[in-house]
Amino acid sequence: MLQPKRTKFRKQHKGRNRGVATRGSKVSFGEFGLKAVGRGRITARQLEAARRAISRHVKRGGRIWIRIFPDKPISKKPAEVRMGKGKGNPEYWVALIQPGKVLYEMEGVTEEVAREAFALGAAKLPVQTAFVSRRVMG
């Protein structure tokens, strides 16, 4: 599963997930993409589950790019522990998703296969998504 090799600090503030994605909002590596329409957090496990579903459907035909990385640690206190005594330990990693962010890209397959594969992958994700393709001018 994806997670940073090392970070400057072990824990992060919760923060707020506002605005829309301006960077990473266009299909830039592949031919087709899966773009987030809603906002939320995608865990490293969900990202991997969706990747497996997509790659299982395209088999050896296409190439897949993951355009997001879970770089935010989410901490959690153990079960049945009283409040206080500091912040809990990092439990898992998430990527914050804003509307417009391209999550996955694919090339080397037909549009029909790409749509089916991304539909299978999107079912594993907690955000609403849309299928997009690269617009070629001319």
Curated annotation (Swiss-Prot):
GO CC, one annotated term: cytosolic large ribosomal subunit
Query: Does the keyword Chaperone belong to this entry?
Result: no
Q: Give one Pfam hit by family name.
A: Ribosomal_L16
Q: Which family does it belong to?
A: Belongs to the universal ribosomal protein uL16 family.
PANTHER family the UniProt entry points to: 50S/60S RIBOSOMAL PROTEIN L16, LARGE RIBOSOMAL SUBUNIT PROTEIN UL16M
What GO terms are given for molecular function? Answer: rRNA binding; structural constituent of ribosome; tRNA binding
A GO BP term here is: translation
Give positions of region: Disordered: 1-22
User: How does this protein assemble?
Assistant: Part of the 50S ribosomal subunit.
Q: What species is given as this protein's source?
A: Acidithiobacillus ferrooxidans (strain ATCC 23270 / DSM 14882 / CIP 104768 / NCIMB 8455) (Ferrobacillus ferrooxidans (strain ATCC 23270))
Q: Which UniProt keywords apply?
A: Ribonucleoprotein, Ribosomal protein, RNA-binding, rRNA-binding, tRNA-binding
Regions of compositional bias (Basic residues) in chain numbering:
1-17
Q: What does this protein do?
A: Binds 23S rRNA and is also seen to make contacts with the A and possibly P site tRNAs.
NCBIfam families the UniProt entry points to:
rplP_bact
Annotated protein name in UniProt: Large ribosomal subunit protein uL16
The record, for InterPro entries, names: Ribosomal_uL16 (IPR047873), Ribosomal_uL16_bact-type (IPR000114), Ribosomal_uL16_CS (IPR020798), Ribosomal_uL16_dom (IPR016180), Ribosomal_uL16_sf (IPR036920)
